[in-house]
UniProtKB/Swiss-Prot annotation, chain A:
This is B9 domain-containing protein 1. Belongs to the B9D family. Residues 8-126 form the C2 B9-type domain. It is found in: Cytoplasm, Cytoskeleton, Cilium basal body. It comes from Xenopus tropicalis (Western clawed frog). The gene is b9d1. Part of the tectonic-like complex (also named B9 complex). One of its GO terms (cellular component) is MKS complex. Pfam families: B9-C2. Component of the tectonic-like complex, a complex localized at the transition zone of primary cilia and acting as a barrier that prevents diffusion of transmembrane proteins between the cilia and plasma membranes. Required for ciliogenesis and sonic hedgehog/SHH signaling.
């Protein structure tokens, strides 16, 4: 029996390029991946933590990390396609690190170079009393596990405030996805309508 | 060269069925009068469709955005269907709700869209509408808030009973969805 491939590979390299947070400075970010049961990383780094960056002096006020990502996954089934989860932290007025944003996006599906702008958000206190205590104690609400932002269930109880965004670029190579019968189309946006950025 | 092109490995659970993966995000919404918004969503398919994995309905987080021109939900979607036919291609229906500072929810818009049949990544904008009600109800809504809602969500994605409604345009929902197809070529079905 001629045995064809039984798994496909998804190789992603890229970088967390930069962020826009008009209100905050001296930020660093962490990244990790969330993927389904059929998926497994075969090589590369599954999580990382960047340097602390300050805003540029010029008018653009960019926060540049230029932080590398390299990972390869294998799977038999696109269900549970990996998502990159990014969380951004920075010092508050007392010098304690607090979260400034969580965000997630699926890794691109087609071979080639892709750029993604990920909107970031932080959870909010659900009651006025909690809001007061968090203001008084100088601790703002955080997710105990940032990976919840890649999950769809149980989000109806979450209140968030969106602020800022992170720009990530990816280079994607796939292997044997077509041989296993999957058609992911080609090109990034075959019939794209322009997405308005905040 | 390709002696095994016709002997591809198919998963045993659905050896002969065509498969559709729908993966992506409900990104957020813009163009609404207020932007403290959340969204209830669901996917409706015909009888020939079988859900193999994933969830087909849910509710997003409530966003109170810092800058008030767009609400972000970044709500992930991941579904795997098997189908015997093209009839009843999946439709996504959306309900956008506004949450005020007291935690009260009011309906801001309904919308539906067909999942694109072309494989690939699609950036989509789905315009929404809400029922208008009678003029008495409209005046009441100006003072009290709230407003008429549909009794059955089938009106959102069905066309047969819409002629009874008077509606008004609301904002739009931004989505990015990737469609992955499998085994459609086997049956001569051309999707791209």
């Amino acid at each position: 029996m001629a045995s064809g491939p039984s798994v496909f590979l998804l190789n992603v390299s890229g970088q967390i390029e930069s962020a826009e947070f008009p209100e905050f400075d001296d930020l660093y970010c962490k990244y990790s991946f969330v993927y389904g049961h059929d998926w497994a990383p075969t090589s590369g780094v599954e999580e990382g933590i960047s340097q602390i960056t300050s805003k540029s002096q010029g008018g653009k006020q960019a926060l540049v990390w230029n932080f590398p990502i390299e990972i390869t996954f294998k799977s038999t089934n696109p269900f549970g396609w990996p998502q990159i989860v990014i969380s951004v932290y920075g010092p508050d007025a007392f010098g304690n690190d607090v979260v400034r944003g969580y965000g997630a996006v699926h890794l691109p599906f087609t071979p080639g170079r892709h750029a993604r702008t990920i909107p970031m958000f932080v959870p909010e206190s659900s009651s006025r009393l909690q809001r007061f205590t968090s203001w008084f104690m100088g601790r703002r609400p955080e997710f105990t596990d940032p990976k919840v932002v890649a999950q769809g269930e149980g989000r109806e109880v979450t209140r968030v405030r969106s602020q800022g965004c992170v720009t990530v670029s990816f280079n994607v190579v796939t292997k044997d996805l077509k041989k296993l019968g999957y058609n992911t189309g080609s090109g990034d946006f075959p019939n794209a309508t322009t997405m308005s950025q905040p | 060269m390709n002696s095994h092109t016709h002997e591809l490995h198919y998963s045993p659970t659905c050896a002969v069925m065509a498969e559709v993966h729908i993966i992506g995000q409900i990104i957020g919404a813009s163009g609404f009068p207020q932007h403290s918004l959340f969204c209830k969503w669901g996917v409706h398919t015909g009888g020939a469709w079988k859900l193999l994995s994933g969830v087909v309905e849910g509710q997003t987080q409530v966003d109170h955005p810092q800058n008030d021109d767009m609400a972000f939900w970044s709500h992930p979607i991941d579904m795997h269907f098997a189908t015997k036919g093209l009839q009843g291609w999946p439709k996504l229906h959306l309900q956008v709700w506004h949450q005020d500072t007291f935690g009260r929810n009011e309906l801001y818009g309904y919308s539906f869209l067909h999942i694109p049949s072309t494989p690939g990544t699609h950036s989509l904008l789905s315009p929404t509408w809400r029922p208008l009600g009678t003029w008495q109800e409209q005046i009441c809504q100006m003072f009290v808030g709230g407003g008429p809602q549909l009794k059955s969500s089938s009106l959102i994605y069905g066309g047969s009973d819409r002629y009874r409604l008077q509606t008004v345009a609301m904002g739009q929902v931004h989505l990015q969805l990737t469609v992955i197809l499998r085994n459609f070529e086997r049956y001569g079905v051309e999707c791209s």
